[in-house]
């Protein structure tokens, strides 16, 4: 394995950590409700736990309403029960044809709690990025130990991995800050 391959490995895996962070952010509630809040709720679909978005059409009708239209109307009760068990802070409104979820405007406390979750997701991403850095550094040190690279190349390699790490940590910080502003905006 060459140094360039190690850098590529580090970039790829750190990018995956960023992608996971963005996915995690989709589950957070902002001033506008998104379908991501309910899409991964599992519904018992003929004995198999199935994500809600695979058993029904899930649409954000407006800033505070999500409409769920199951492909199979016999699932209405099951979907309603799954939403109540998911404890997302709303009661499902079943009209016999579809389920509507009315989300009240977020309170300051709820916004602060969501912002705190955003920070926690950011910390989780930073830990993952640092773990990738550790793995990349270990690979570089092994190359030096096996005499595949010189001491100078080892030093340059470790510095380059640190630069890549700093770049991705900054991206995480920027994303967290942006998400917090989005959450706190009334």
UniProtKB/Swiss-Prot annotation:
Q: Which GO terms describe its cellular component?
A: cytosol
Classification via SUPFAM superfamilies: Ribosome recycling factor, RRF
UniProt GO MF annotations: ribosomal large subunit binding
Pfam family membership, one: RRF
Q: Does the keyword Manganese apply?
A: no
Q: Which CDD domains match?
A: RRF
Query: Which terms does the UniProt entry file under GO BP?
Result: cytoplasmic translational termination
Q: Where in the cell is it found?
A: Cytoplasm
Q: Which InterPro entries does the UniProt record give?
A: Ribosome_recyc_fac (IPR002661), Ribosome_recyc_fac_dom (IPR023584), RRF_sf (IPR036191)
Q: Which UniProt keywords apply?
A: Cytoplasm, Protein biosynthesis
Top-level taxon of the source organism: Bacteria
Known role: Responsible for the release of ribosomes from messenger RNA at the termination of protein biosynthesis. May increase the efficiency of translation by recycling ribosomes from one round of translation to another.
Family of the protein in this entry: Belongs to the RRF family.
**NCBIfam families reported in the protein's UniProt record:** frr
Q: Which PANTHER family match?
A: MITOCHONDRIAL RIBOSOME RECYCLING FACTOR PSEUDO 1 (PTHR20982:SF3), RIBOSOME RECYCLING FACTOR (PTHR20982)
Task: Return the HAMAP family for the record.
Answer: RRF
Protein's name in the database: Ribosome-recycling factor
Q: Which organism is it from?
A: Nitratiruptor sp. (strain SB155-2)
